[in-house]
């Protein structure tokens, strides 16, 4: 990819700031990252036309907030219809046609980093799959969508059975009280909009970008009550730590087995010591591996059910990256992908601790050792995805 100068609201800036259109914005820290902003003129991202993510405050996003940190409205204040085609949503879509992409945090986006954004021409020519309404929007260069989002990310409940230091400072589990009520009110609005009336519409939900779907009473009740027969073309994807995803729970959700699609299980370690002592506090390594072996066997029965094993790279675990690939290949042979990404700032660490964890920063004392790890040919393995670490490996191989 060719490169252009950093934009004022993109990868060159960090911290809290006030944007003239979007108000208060938090740009994640990328200082110390050896990175150049790519030239994305003529490229296309379907997130801006299809994706809605709702967080615990009711704020609505058109992508992961770390990658596109501008919310387009609040579900507690406005209808989904008004938010989806409101002025903020339209403003974000304009960058597809202007080609400057200055709102995206390209350094954190794994799709941009791995150069996997299709061209607009490929979408229009049918070389890249897309909905008909997407093609019509591209042809007409319109920034108002004719249909509601086709992918909905439930990120409104942070409840989790673990307390991973990169994500939170204490265990969060909402089962009653005002904080629970607020999160359930948001969830009820989303259910009302997308999961109340049976339909054969093709759409998907993702649970969850905020906690664990099985630790959350809100999500657990929602998934237990869903009947796939009412939504035959609904795809259900999940992100979970896997500890509670037991064979017993699997049997409990038998009515949605045929709706299950991608399941992202985040281990962030290749050893029991690192997992239970550093990256996944309150976790149970042996139970996790047992659950994953069971889920791996279910992939043989349900061809659309795919498991992606995630690994967020930081100082505490980067030396286990190779071992992680070997572990997944050996123990879970039916996996779809082994996906890596770099740690980002969720506000749980002090600046000093965060910088110590960011092995990707050029000024980190062990940055070269990290690059040496990335030189291993195992990262060329089929089904290994480096995402936003792609540029790091490119740098390592150029040494």
For each predicted feature, which ranges?
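Residue-level recognition of short, well-ordered coil/turn positions
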Residues: 88, 100, 231, 300-303
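Membrane-interface junctions of multi-pass transporters
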Residues: 38, 68-111
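Short, intrinsically disordered, charge-biased short linear motifs at domain edges
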Residues: 29-33, 50-51, 87-99, 148-155
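Disulfide-bonded cysteine motifs in exported proteins
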Residues: 40, 99, 104, 155, ...
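Short cysteine clusters
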Residues: 45, 60-64, 104-109, 160, ...
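Radical SAM enzyme [4Fe-4S]-AdoMet core and its adjacent flexible, acidic
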Residues: 1-78, 82, 124, 155, ...
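Extracellular structured ligand-interaction cores
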Residues: 49, 57, 69, 101, ...
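Conserved alpha-helical substructure of the radical SAM core
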Residues: 72, 111-263, 273-300, 327, ...
């Amino acid at each position: 990819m060719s490169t252009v100068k950093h934009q004022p609201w993109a990868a060159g800036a960090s911290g809290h700031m006030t944007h003239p259109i979007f108000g208060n914005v938090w740009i994640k820290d990328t200082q110390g990252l050896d990175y150049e902003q790519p030239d994305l003129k003529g490229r296309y991202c379907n997130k801006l036309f299809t994706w809605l993510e709702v967080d615990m405050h009711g704020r609505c996003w058109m992508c992961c907030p770390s990658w596109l940190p501008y919310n387009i409205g609040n579900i507690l204040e406005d209808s989904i219809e008004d938010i989806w085609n409101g002025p903020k949503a339209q403003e974000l879509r304009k960058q597809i046609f202007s080609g400057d992409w200055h709102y995206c945090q390209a350094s954190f986006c794994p799709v941009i980093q791995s150069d996997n954004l299709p061209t607009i021409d490929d979408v229009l020519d049918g070389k890249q799959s897309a909905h008909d309404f997407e093609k019509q929007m591209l042809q007409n260069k319109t920034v108002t969508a004719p249909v509601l989002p086709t992918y909905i990310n439930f990120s409104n409940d942070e409840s989790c059975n673990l307390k991973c230091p990169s994500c939170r400072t204490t265990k969060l589990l909402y089962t009653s009280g005002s904080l629970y009520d607020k999160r359930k009110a948001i969830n009820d609005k989303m259910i009302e909009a997308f999961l109340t009336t049976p339909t054969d519409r093709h759409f998907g939900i993702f649970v969850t970008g905020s906690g664990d779907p099985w630790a959350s009473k809100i999500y657990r009740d929602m998934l237990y009550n869903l009947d796939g027969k009412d939504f035959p073309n609904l795809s259900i994807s999940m992100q979970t730590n896997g500890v509670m995803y037991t064979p017993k729970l699997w049997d409990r959700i038998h009515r949605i087995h045929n709706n299950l699609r991608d399941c992202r299980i985040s281990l962030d370690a290749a050893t029991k010591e690192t997992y239970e002592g550093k990256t996944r506090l309150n976790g149970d390594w042996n139970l996790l591996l047992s659950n994953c072996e069971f889920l791996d066997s279910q992939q043989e029965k349900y061809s659309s059910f795919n498991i992606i094993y995630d690994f967020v790279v930081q100082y505490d675990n980067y030396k286990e990256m190779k071992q992680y690939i070997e572990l997944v290949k050996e123990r879970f042979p039916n996996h779809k992908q082994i996906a890596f990404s770099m740690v980002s700032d969720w506000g749980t660490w002090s600046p000093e601790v965060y910088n110590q964890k960011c092995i990707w920063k050029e000024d980190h004392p062990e940055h070269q050792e990290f690059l040496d790890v990335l030189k291993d040919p195992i990262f060329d393995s089929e089904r290994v995805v480096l995402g936003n670490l792609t540029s790091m490996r490119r740098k390592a191989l150029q040494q």
